[in-house]
């Protein structure tokens, strides 16, 4: 039996209930460009309000709260970014968390959680093509920020013997495709994603100087073919956006895109049979409830079943350092 969790105190429950306040303060400041406006300087709240086009009194109250949170400092009526804010929240800094703009957009979808639980479906439309341009750019930036940090380790767990062609389905910025071509000389990769995403993909790939090794193909993986003769078809953070039937069909398409001996590799939150671990996956399932038409987090048995039905053999699972797992199957 797993060890019992100590009971939550009244104060801990209140802290959970009010945790949204600090989150909203940070996201509002980020959305307004407050940290970037401060930069490395020292400014009055009135000066910042003038720069970002906000009410002076309300801006001072916001900045005072940011001081209490450790994100700003205040001395003689002038505010500065803390070291952490300078490193992570100022747009030109190397460690800039540009993906937080996607979190700003997630706030809107999460406010619909009560209605989503009542009705069983998210309020928002599923496809990126139906999103506004700003949403799409922020989403891809958020995924890129995380993927660039995680991709080398994730790809490093995959046996690349005899691999020369990789298809990254729904590859977004191309971070994983770029990790594949960097992991082994002679590998070429193709990113398959929606027509509205591909121009963003090309921009990220060009900035990394990998346009000769990473190709792009526009399409909708639910409706279009994926090509053929790939050694690996890779799906990272894809299946959670889809329904079980959509995933079964998608894995079938991926299998058809393989050479004999090739593999489909799925990376995602893979839940236990009780759907309680990993714990991050339980929360992410709600993110899919409010943000997609029919997405979810799935169990190992579900993913393995789709692979077996698609004719893949030797289905196996391995964990990653990031709370996700890889499940792979081979076409014999």
Residue ranges and their predicted role:
Residues 3, 10-32, 36-42, 50-51, ...:
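Conserved Class I S-adenosyl-L-methionine-dependent methyltransferase catalytic core
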Residues 1-74, 160, 165, 169-332:
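Alpha-helical subdomain
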């Amino acid at each position: 039996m797993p060890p019992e969790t100590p009971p939550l105190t009244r104060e801990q429950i209140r802290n959970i209930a009010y945790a949204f306040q600090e989150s909203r303060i940070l996201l509002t400041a980020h959305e307004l460009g407050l940290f970037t406006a401060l930069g490395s300087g020292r400014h009055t709240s009135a000066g910042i309000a003038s720069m970002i086009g906000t009410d002076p009194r309300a801006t001072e109250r916001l900045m005072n709260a940011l001081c209490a949170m450790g994100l700003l400092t205040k001395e003689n009526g002038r505010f500065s970014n803390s070291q952490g804010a300078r490193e992570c929240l100022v747009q030109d800094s190397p460690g800039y968390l540009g993906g937080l703009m996607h979190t700003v957009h997630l706030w809107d979808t999460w406010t619909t959680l009560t209605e989503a639980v009542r009705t069983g479906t998210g309020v928002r439309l599923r496809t990126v093509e139906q999103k506004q341009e700003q949403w799409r750019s922020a989403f891809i930036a958020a995924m890129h920020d995380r993927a660039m940090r995680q991709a080398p380790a994730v790809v490093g767990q995959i046996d690349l013997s005899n691999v020369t062609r990789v298809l990254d389905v729904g590859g977004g910025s191309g971070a994983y495709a770029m990790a594949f071509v960097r992991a082994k000389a002679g590998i070429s990769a193709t990113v398959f994603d929606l027509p509205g995403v591909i121009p963003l993909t090309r921009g990220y790939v060009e900035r990394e100087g990998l346009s000769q090794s990473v190709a792009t193909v526009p399409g909708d993986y639910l409706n279009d073919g994926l090509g053929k003769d790939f050694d690996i078809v890779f799906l990272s953070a894809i299946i959670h956006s889809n329904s079980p039937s959509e995933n079964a069909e998608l894995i079938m398409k991926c299998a058809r895109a393989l050479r004999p001996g090739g593999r489909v590799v799925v990376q995602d939150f893979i839940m236990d049979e009780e759907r309680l671990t990993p714990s991050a996956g339980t929360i992410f399932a709600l993110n899919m409830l409010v943000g997609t038409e029919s997405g979810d987090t799935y169990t190992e048995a579900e993913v393995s079943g789709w692979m077996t039905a698609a004719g893949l053999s030797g289905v196996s699972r391995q964990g990653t350092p990031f709370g996700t797992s890889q499940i792979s199957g081979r076409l014999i």
